[in-house]
Amino acid sequence: MVWLRAPDRVVVHPSTVEGRVEAPPSKSYTHRMLFLALLARGRSVVRRPLVSNDTLATLNAVALLGGKPRLGRGVAEVEGGEVRGGAVVYAAGSGTTIRIAMGVAAHSAEATLLYGDESLNRRPVHPLSEALRSMGARVCDTGGNPPVKVSGPLRRASVEVDAAISSQFATSLLIAGSRLGEFELSAARLSSRGYVDITLESLSMFGVRVEREGYRLFRLRGTPKPVDAAVPGDYSSASFMLAAGAIAGRVEVEGLRPVDPQPDRRIVELLRSMGARVRVEGGVVAVESTGPLEPVDVDLDGSPDLAPVAAVLAAYARGVSRLRGLERLKYKESDRLSAIAWNLARLGVEARVRGGILEIRGGGVEGGVARSWGDHRIAMAMAVAGLGARRPVAVEGFSRVPDSYPGFLEDLARLGARVEAVKGGGV
């Protein structure tokens, strides 16, 4: 497996940005569509997939679990139909990969061992393990975390799961359950519901009939069929470029669906509420700075991946912002809540964590040295923070950015940002 690489250290100088970039393909859709292509009997064509380290981990898992993937320029083809166990699957830092792969691996009687890097092996899978066991799978995890060994078959077509920690538990069970022909999932305390909406849209795309009672009960009918479909643009990655426009100029991002279940589409509403000039026309979102931003009091429980960039926007607001609903950030690639507060303090911004609330006293960013803590979204958010700072911002540990947005630096430079990269190292 060849991983994408990026510099270890990046320095972002105060800059004015202007121009248009294309949104990267959605990471969430790419993961789901590749795994569903493995479960569909026949050849699927996934157009415009995201090629990042996280999705390469999924492509590798698909191959090890019995699919025959081929990655070309702007397209991924997968010959699916048979799930094969007996493999050792390395998911790198991708929680989506390992959790969906656990459910898929339970369709084989041969045991599959799944593990990740140090950060992934600290992320919980226990509720998913319990749900798969109740369906008849044999699951042995490590104190509730990876590494985890899974073997099937799945004998029961209905299950309950506690999805308070992560909606990925529900996503894994829905994708695995789609292979059974009929399946029913009861999800308790479902978090980040928009990501389950992405899963349901992906299932429908592959011909699975979906019925639901709110976000509590889901029923599936039919099995996945091969598709020829394209991946939509990613609001999560686009949020960084849109924030750059709100802080330091004017940015347009194309390739974003105006109507989309992605939770991070909320960035558009957030930027408007903070006083940035926002225009949405067709598949283009344009954001322009109007001066200092306005503080907000906002609950991000449904869109936790926006927290790093929302915190940076709050640093440029004139007043105190409160970002709520952030309790689950400690289960991300880093303890994301602590990492955000730590970095803002390093850059001269007053930030305080109170339970699941992050309070930020805005007024601008001084500059200094930030650290990614091994988290791609923290790295990108701190780079954006440097655009309007009083002096440069250096971001250490930038090499994780290709996990989700390999073209981030190139897009930032295309918009006119002054960026210095120190080569070397990798993911």
From Swiss-Prot:
GO BP term, example: amino acid biosynthetic process
Top-level EC class, please?
transferase
Residues reported in the UniProt entry to bind phosphoenolpyruvate: 27, 95, 123, 168, 336, 377
Amino-acid positions noted as binding 3-phosphoshikimate in the UniProt annotation, renumbered to this chain: 27-28, 32, 166-168, 192, 305, 332
What is a single cellular component term in the Gene Ontology annotation? cytoplasm
Q: Which GO terms describe its molecular function?
A: 3-phosphoshikimate 1-carboxyvinyltransferase activity
Q: Which residues form the active site?
A: 305
UniProt xrefs under InterPro entries? Enolpyruvate_Tfrase_dom, Enolpyruvate_Tfrase_sf, EPSP_synthase, EPSP_synthase_CS, RNA3'P_cycl/enolpyr_Trfase_a/b
Question: From which domain of life does this come?
Answer: Archaea
Presence of the UniProt keyword Cell wall biogenesis/degradation in the record: no
The record's section on Pfam families has: EPSP_synthase
E.C. number, please?
2.5.1.19
Q: Where is this protein localized, as stated in its record? A: Cytoplasm
- State if Transport is listed as a keyword: no
* Keywords linked to the UniProt accession: Amino-acid biosynthesis, Aromatic amino acid biosynthesis, Cytoplasm, Transferase
Q: Which reaction does it catalyse?
A: 3-phosphoshikimate + phosphoenolpyruvate = 5-O-(1-carboxyvinyl)-3-phosphoshikimate + phosphate
Q: Which PROSITE patterns match?
A: EPSP_SYNTHASE_1, EPSP_SYNTHASE_2
Q: In which pathway does it act?
A: Metabolic intermediate biosynthesis; chorismate biosynthesis
**Which PANTHER family does this UniProt record tie to the protein?**
AROM/DEHYDROQUINATE SYNTHASE (PTHR21090), PENTAFUNCTIONAL AROM POLYPEPTIDE (PTHR21090:SF5)
What is the protein's quaternary organization?
Answer: Monomer.
The record's family statement is: Belongs to the EPSP synthase family.
Query: What is the role of this chain?
Result: Catalyzes the transfer of the enolpyruvyl moiety of phosphoenolpyruvate (PEP) to the 5-hydroxyl of shikimate-3-phosphate (S3P) to produce enolpyruvyl shikimate-3-phosphate and inorganic phosphate.
NCBIfam families found in the cross-reference section: aroA
Question: What is the protein named?
Answer: 3-phosphoshikimate 1-carboxyvinyltransferase
What species does this protein belong to?
Aeropyrum pernix (strain ATCC 700893 / DSM 11879 / JCM 9820 / NBRC 100138 / K1)
Q: Gene symbol?
A: aroA
